[in-house]
Amino acid sequence: FRNIGALDIDNLKGVVFFTGENGSGKTNILESISIASQLKSFRNADDRDMIQWDEKDFFISVTDENRNTYEVGFSSDEEKVRKKTKMNGNQIAKASEYYSRLLTVFYGPEDNRLVTGTHEERRKYIDSVIAKTSSEYIRLLNDFRKILTSRNALLKEIRENRKKDSELDIWDSLFSDRASKIMEKRRAAMEFFSVHFRSSYERISEMNEIPDIRYLPNMQECDSRAIAGKIERGRKKDIAFGSSLQGPHRDRYCFM
């Protein structure tokens, strides 16, 4: 894995510091933990880049304080990188079923963009936080992304007179169903998170200001029927732009 051929670290308790020369692999150790936790790098690195250039695979095993063991293996062939996961020796076939088992939080300088960055960056980060505690939310997001991609492709074909408007009916129904459930999950998460956000800020700040983080959904409608109605009313504009202009993919989060 990266520049680490083999490494065993035992009995990590309390606050732990990794020290060493630049380029010695300190961050790579943290990255390996993120792989074991969420099956991807917190650096957003390509899967192939993490495999040593003269190797075809790597293996990571982490045991938590409850003695649960999580094992992740990445193997590369000419087509793609394949991932295998196990918990306590039992193979887990779906990534969505593994994802929320070993919970970790990574914070680095680039995470300041949660405040200074775009709405898309905040939305992506908060989605990842919710997903760590809800495998259902992972499935909803994956479904919605596929539906959104298919709907946008169809919108472009309708604009070019290669498809009929009526073909949107099935996609709009699926879109509205997943959208309402995603928005419900996000609202519930923000209600829970905002309370802890304010209390945590008060403990570290000597200022009297009370900050908040707010969820600003792109659509005020909550149930799938109301969302479907709004989506249908916006069809002409969506077709003209060749893109879905409304939905949870355009939700915003703001720090106040």
What does each model-identified segment do?
Residues 13, 24, 28, 45, ...:
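Generic alpha-helix structural propensity
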Residues 1-21, 35, 159-256:
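Conserved NTPase motor "head" modules and their coupling/switch loops across ABC/AAA+ ATPases, GTPases
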Residues 53, 144-147, 186:
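Intracellular alpha-helical coupling/juxtamembrane segments of multi-pass membrane proteins
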Residues 13-49, 133:
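Phosphate-binding glycine-rich loops of NTP-binding sites
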Residues 113, 120-169, 173:
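Long, charged N-terminal accessory/stalk domains
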Residues 37-121, 125-137, 194-202, 224, ...:
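Nucleotide-state sensing region of NTPase/ATPase domains
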Residues 32-33, 103-106, 172:
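Short hydrophobic/aromatic segments of transmembrane alpha-helices and their interfaces
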